[in-house]
Amino acid sequence: MAGAAVTAAIAAQPRRPIKWPAQAMIHVWLDPRTAPPGAGALVDRALRTWNAAAGGRFVLRKEGSSASASVRVRFAQADGIYGETSPRIDGATGFIGSADVLIAGDLAGDATQQRIVIYLTALHELGHALGLPHTDAFDDIMYSFRRPDDGARYFGAYRRRLRSAEDIGSERATGLSPADVAALQSLYDG
């Protein structure tokens, strides 16, 4: 889902984990001009999902203004990708200082499929904005999505777990694997 920008940034610092400072209040802004209808609620669900997984190690908070936001989420034509995240590391502290998240807004499929793709892509890209790298485990939201059909297979597997579209991003269908939660908590406990 993510492009080379986040992978290179995370790989460039093998000695020190890339993350936000302890107990950070991370302000997230969603560009309303670019968001498809209903996308804001799905991004909100992704924020709540990561907040629950963090258990107070940080707080992602929706912000009404881009000027005071550390993470900016925008939607755009995807050109073959679902999303991309570009974190910026603060040279003085070594912590993430800000991140730009881009999510595909031009999606095919029925309304439920579009909601699934937006939610899971937001969850994946926000995971990168928090400092999580790709994994090789298909069940993880941070899976690397290397094969051409990985996205369709992953989104299809998630859809089969839903009882209805209202389950998207619910406690019953967070989209996070136990390994995703463990990786996040380990990153912020270290």
Named regions from a protein language model:
Residues W20-A35, I96-G105, R160-D167:
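Acidic/histidine-rich, surface-exposed loop or edge segments in extracytoplasmic proteins
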Residues F138-G190:
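Extracellular (secreted or membrane-anchored) zinc-dependent metallopeptidases
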